[in-house]
From Swiss-Prot:
GO terms for molecular function: IMP dehydrogenase activity; metal ion binding; nucleotide binding. This is Inosine-5'-monophosphate dehydrogenase. Residues 475-488 have a biased composition (Polar residues). K(+) binds at G302, G304, C307, E471, S472, H473. IMP binds at S305, D340, G341, G342, G363, S364, Y387, R388, G389, M390, G391, E417. Its EC number is 1.1.1.205. Mycophenolic acid (MPA) is a non-competitive inhibitor that prevents formation of the closed enzyme conformation by binding to the same site as the amobile flap. In contrast, mizoribine monophosphate (MZP) is a competitive inhibitor that induces the closed conformation. MPA is a potent inhibitor of mammalian IMPDHs but a poor inhibitor of the bacterial enzymes. MZP is a more potent inhibitor of bacterial IMPDH. Pfam families: CBS, IMPDH. Belongs to the IMPDH/GMPR family.
Length: 488
């Protein structure tokens, strides 16, 4: 032990390059899909971080539509986080199997509140909540000129000539019915009982986002962060009830007894939910979490742009080595790891994937997009969005202190492991994802990798020094026009 104290040398993204190989792979033909677990299949290997300036429902919806996954942060109340998950799960459906419904005796005000809360344009009306016999439908058109919202729904709903379809109707069949009758919502009934709903908006979204990441019911995938605090059990329960697909047990040090016990507890209670645990940076930690029941392990101690763990606590492993060591252990279990942090360019993504990551988690690269929840501000004539680490004072005061095992401390006693800052505004998420995945596709073409498994198994690295890094970036020239995928 003592003799080997300084034996390990570690590498990060700027220390290595992928070696080009013989290839018949065209970048546009590269397969970017990945299976993280039995129930989580993504069409791009990208996950947005569970940070309070990166991912809420708006980002999670946009990520899933691009084929990735969003992790809704936990710096909010339990009910609020569950509602954020519900917004994602209800934003897009092949067939809505559990549609919202109201009864004729409820008020128009209640209908307006429900439709506003979940941003829906109509709701089926049933005779009562037990029999659920369909008796009408209420849409925005029915409410357009209403002034007295205390009246009953029965006074304004559409009752006559309701257009319905039987359970089992396909989306193609539903589209024909909707277009023929010029309606937007098609209730699915069986013996008069409301059993489902298909909307024209959902059909349009299927056509607009053909590569969206969805569950077995055609709903967008959603993940949510939990911790190891006192409210974790009830938080997890509410998230599962809301339809979450993956629970991220998110801590700064995943190789700790509290996290391992939490993984065991969650996997035992929710075997159908994908359990992701982290963060770790060693093979031993990876093994411990997989043996505890984790489906996926998240790798990264201190590589993030807003993280100060390595300089405050003096702890961490440079990210490429951490990914490789953890992936080597994960291969023994036939399970996946997520490379979390330190990624500055699309080239870093493909390096992380080639080193053994099944997917990457991004914070700073996505924090400047339109869909992130960070506040927009103007500085020296340019637009920026606020971006902060979950170990920053502001985030810890809002609730992330348990991530750093400081739940019992008052704000004055917090020892932060992150900073608060700003990042340039980038516009819509889809533009950023397009550029990032374009870089990954290019790398797969250079390395002759038709899919991500081949990239993980066969791609080779070369080490480089500071001169090699300087040579890799533009040099001996003044950049006069910025590129959409490069800033330094």
């Amino acid at each position: 032990m003592w003799e080997n104290k300084f034996a390990k040398e570690s590498l990060t993204f700027d220390d290595v390059l992928l070696i080009p190989a013989a290839s018949d792979v065209l970048p546009n033909d590269a397969d970017l899909s990945v299976e993280l677990s039995e129930r989580i299949k993504l069409n791009i290997p990208v996950i947005s971080a569970g940070m309070d300036t990166v991912t809420e429902s708006k980002m999670a919806i946009a990520m899933a539509r691009q084929g990735g996954l969003g992790v809704i942060h936990k710096n909010m109340g339990i009910e609020e986080q569950a509602e954020e998950v519900q917004k994602v799960k209800r934003s897009e459906n092949g067939v809505i199997t559990n549609p919202f419904y109201l009864t004729p005796d409820e008020s128009v005000y209640e209908a307006e509140a429900l439709m506003g809360k979940y941003r829906i344009s109509g709701v089926p009306i049933v005779s009562d909540k037990e029999s659920r016999e369909l008796v009408g439908i209420l849409t925005n058109r029915d409410l357009r000129f209403i002034e007295d919202f205390s009246i009953k729904i029965s006074d304004v709903m559409t009752k006559e000539n309701l257009i319905t379809a039987p359970v089992g109707t396909t989306l193609d069949e539903a589209e024909t019915i909707l277009q023929e009758h010029k309606i937007e919502k098609l209730p699915l009934v069986e013996n008069g009982r409301l059993e489902g709903l298909i909307t024209i908006k959902d059909i349009e979204k299927v056509l607009e986002f053909p590569h969206a990441a969805k569950d077995a019911h055609g709903r967008l995938l959603a993940a949510a962060a939990i911790g190891t605090s006192k409210d974790t059990e009830i938080r997890a329960q509410k998230l599962v009830e809301a339809g979450v697909d993956a629970l991220i047990i998110d801590t700064a040090h995943g190789h700790s007894s509290g996290v391992i016990q939490e993984v065991k507890k969650m996997k035992e209670k929710y075997p159908e939910i994908t359990i992701v645990a982290g963060n770790v940076a060693t093979a031993e930690a990876t093994r411990a979490l997989f043996e505890a029941g984790a489906d996926v392990v998240k790798v990264g101690i201190g590589p993030g742009s807003i993280c100060t763990t390595r300089v405050v606590a003096g702890v961490g492993v440079p990210q490429i080595t951490a990914i490789y060591d953890c992936a080597t252990e994960a291969r023994k279990f036939g399970k996946a790891i997520i490379a979390d942090g330190g990624i500055k360019f699309s080239g870093d993504i493909i390096k992380a994937l080639a080193a053994g990551g099944h997917a990457v988690m991004l914070g700073s690269l996505l924090a400047g997009t339109e869909e992130s929840p960070g506040a927009t501000e103007v500085f020296q004539g340019r637009q920026y969005k606020v971006y902060r680490g979950m170990g920053s004072l502001g985030a810890m005061e809002k609730g992330s202190n348990d991530r750093y095992f400081q739940e019992d401390k008052t704000p004055r006693k917090f020892v932060p492991e992150g900073i608060e800052g700003r990042t340039a505004y980038k516009g819509p998420l889809q533009d950023t994802i397009y550029q990032l995945m374009g870089g990954v596709r290019a790398g797969m073409g250079y390395t002759g990798s038709p899919d991500l498994k081949t990239l993980r198994d066969e791609a080779q690295f070369t080490r480089m020094g500071p001169a090699g890094l300087a040579e890799s970036h533009p040099h001996n020239v003044q950049i006069t026009k910025e590129s959409p995928n490069y800033s330094f």
